[in-house]
Amino acid sequence: ASPVLDANGDPLVPGGQYYVLPHIWPGPGGLSFEKTGNQTCPVSVFQLPRLPLEQNNGKPLVFTPVSETDDINEDTAVEIAFAEPPSCAESGKWLIVNDFKEEYWSVGIGGPQDHEGYQTLTGYFKIHKVGSFAYMFSFLPFVR
């Protein structure tokens, strides 16, 4: 598998901090966490809006390979977490959340107790190359 590359063309380093930005410029901003609904802690992952004259980078993420290797490769399982999560959350680790009403799922952070009243799925993510200069994430739920 090929290594996942940063904007400079260098392989991602496990434990390093990276901003996830859209590949279109100008475009929306990077990723951050916010409060939604009746949350008292900002545990919902959002893409920030574009700022008029500057890039809105959002908050840095850390990628951790799940396999025995120390490499972060395309199409292999990784954990994704915000480097500096809010202190009220269990962690900055990503998970999938559903409110039982909508047909779509969203990305949150922390643990199930951070999303009381919601269905949560924990698991890993894969990073897939899309075109020449972009990547997308997919989710791999833990099977019980």
Curated annotation (Swiss-Prot):
Site (Reactive bond for elastase): V66, S67
Keyword Translocase: no
Short name of one Pfam family: Kunitz_legume
Example GO molecular function: serine-type endopeptidase inhibitor activity
Residues with glycosylation annotation: N38
InterPro entries to which the protein is assigned, alphabetical: Kunitz_inhibitor_STI-like_sf (IPR011065), Prot_inh_Kunz-lg (IPR002160)
Disulfide bridge positions per record: C41-C88
Sorted UniProt keywords: Disulfide bond, Glycoprotein, Protease inhibitor, Serine protease inhibitor
Transferase in keyword set: no
PROSITE patterns xref list: SOYBEAN_KUNITZ
Family affiliation: Belongs to the leguminous Kunitz-type inhibitor family.
Further remarks about this protein from its record: On the 2D-gel the determined pI of this protein is: 4.56, its MW is: 16992.79 kDa.
Function comment: Inhibitor of porcine pancreatic elastase with a Ki of 27 nM. Does not inhibit human neutrophil elastase, bovine trypsin, human plasma kallikrein or porcine pancreatic kallikrein.
Name by which UniProt lists this protein: Kunitz-type elastase inhibitor BrEI
